[in-house]
Amino acid sequence: LDAVTSPPSTPLCLKLARSYDRIGNHAEACRWALSLVDAGDDYAAWQAGWTLFQRNAQRTVWPAARTVKVAIAGSYTTTQLGAMVRLAAARIGIRIDLYESPYGQYQQDIIDPASNLYAFAPDIVLLAVHEGDLHLAEFSPDPAEEVQREVSRWTALWNLATTLSRARIVQHNFAVPCDIPTGHLATRLPGSRYMMTQAVNTGLGAAAGTAVSIVDCERLSALIGKQRWYDPRYWNLSKQAVALDALPLLARHTAAVIAADLGLSRKCLVLDLD
């Protein structure tokens, strides 16, 4: 029964990928490793799938619609995110050559014209940042000015990166944390960090236009659950701002946005014949 489910289950995909890997059928091992992207959001399975895909793709001709150079300019540990994005992108026919900024050096990499980021000559710069990077007070007497200043800070980074390279920008916006000092009162206080963070997200969306693509991490964190999105254990142990369990979801949506930027999104015409 598992063999005819659509999509196949995560354990089945992983079992088949490993079986084909053992017998040396590299193309089928790749196919089933990539099927894990559609099967669910199990981080351990995705990690195993990426290892299997990497090993077998080197030994067979694996077609890719596009090859793209992506630079992750991150404010937290992005090693795991990079692997997950590459797996999700491979599933939709994109081969990613990856550069990762050193931990927390995203601003320095973007500001310095001689940085390794620009030497890499990326097609896409992915700003993988989190709510803790916002220069916002817990409460502001002038929230409009503070929000505008913060929006301008991020758009200045966009403009600098596009001026010093030909790359498009993909920006992760900011997931509002579930622990808020002012609690339910925050929604009544325009100057609370909670409300200003949402205003920054709205401002970035308005400023992006057609030049910058936004991955809506605030929506994704609500989809998976705020307590699953951020786990303080991972932050304290390895400065991982997005919990490992949430990385597959974030990677899938990031890869989809990259595909759309490359013109690889799919159109579907649905006709109701009733």
Where would I find each of the regions flagged by the language model?
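Alpha-helical cap/lid subdomain in secreted, periplasmic
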Residues: 2-10, 15-28, 35, 59-68, ...
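Alpha-helical substrate-recognition element adjacent to the catalytic core
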Residues: 269-270, 274
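Short N-terminal or domain-adjacent regulatory/targeting segments
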Residues: 30-64
